[in-house]
Amino acid sequence: MVVFATPLYYYGMSAQLKTVVDRFCAYNSSLNRRHLKSALLTVAWNSQDWTFEALEAHYKTLVRYINFEDMGMVLGYGCGTPSMTRAGKYPEMAYKLGRSL
């Protein structure tokens, strides 16, 4: 299982996670044959409904290209600080996603 966890930076994943994803190129055929499961966990300060559109599209394209099985996404809208995150529904959503796996 591969879990992509990242804050949202300029409507995409962090540079650190993007570096890891870019390194997949050398292992595409190996990853493709393994039929791994994947999930996306992300948070952002913004709470507009379009906040995660670009990251969702990138994740879904990556999952399709590498032949991962998407197990779900937790998109944490309005999680700009740890206290904002704790006060929201997203920690529980992440917990439930983890339990379902």
Model region roles, listed by residue range:
Residues 1-64:
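Helix-loop-strand module that forms the ligand-binding subsite of alpha/beta enzymes
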Residues 60-101:
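Glycine-rich phosphate/pyrophosphate-binding loop and the adjoining helix
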